[in-house]
Amino acid sequence: MTLPEKLLKITPKILVIMGSVRSKRLCPTIATWVGEMGKRETNFDYEKVDLTDWPLSMSDEPGLPIMGIDVYTQEHTKAWGSKIAGADGFVFVTPQYNGGYPAILKNALDHLYHEWNGKPLLIVSYGGHGGGDCASQLKHVAGFLKMRVAPTMPALTLPRDKIVQGVVDPAVEFTKHLGELKKAFGEFSQLFESNPERKP
């Protein structure tokens, strides 16, 4: 491999975006574990993103995101847009709420448009029944944002007492999901290989 080829082989930067901002939540622990597994499986760079650090209003932008960054008027929107634009791909780690995914995650998605386009996405849900419904909804929305979603969407199941207590050891609780997660990260990595502009 020549030096120019090596320079082009840049390690993708992946944002692990947490879907929950509840005070008593499992999301940070699970997202950290998922990110660490992703690093082992793909050797990409993973950064955890907590939406509590990104207070985005529901309705303070006069323009539509599809019109581009020139319509952004709020500093928090500009900062969020810059954060997402600087990433090469995403992992969403989210609980399922009442058959769907959290409003905070929907708001974060809807604040932007072009910044999401064409980028690989891996969806990991969790809950008493695994969160398959919320994952399906996220996949649908991601399609409208022109993201490229890994086919396998791990749905991590948790017993009710773990959810209520807000304490979990993913390495113990999710052993049965390891095969599915490894498969999903394999598909996620292949999405970069199939995109000539974003090779690992």
Curated annotation (Swiss-Prot):
It is an enzyme of class 1 (oxidoreductase). Its EC number is 1.5.1.39. This is NAD(P)H-dependent FMN reductase C4B3.06c. FMN binds at residues 22, 96-99, 126. Coiled coil: none annotated. Pfam families: FMN_red. The keyword S-adenosyl-L-methionine does not apply. GO terms for molecular function: FMN binding; FMN reductase (NADH) activity; FMN reductase (NADPH) activity; FMN reductase [NAD(P)H] activity; NAD(P)H dehydrogenase (quinone) activity. PANTHER family: CHROMATE REDUCTASE (PTHR30543), NAD(P)H-DEPENDENT FMN REDUCTASE LOT6 (PTHR30543:SF21). GO terms for cellular component: cytosol; nucleus. InterPro entries: Flavoprotein-like_sf (IPR029039), FMN_Rdtase-like_dom (IPR005025), NAD(P)H-dep_reductase (IPR050712). The keyword NAD applies. It comes from Schizosaccharomyces pombe (strain 972 / ATCC 24843) (Fission yeast). Has several reductase activities that are NAD(P)H-dependent and involve FMN as a cofactor. May be involved in ferric iron assimilation. Homodimer.
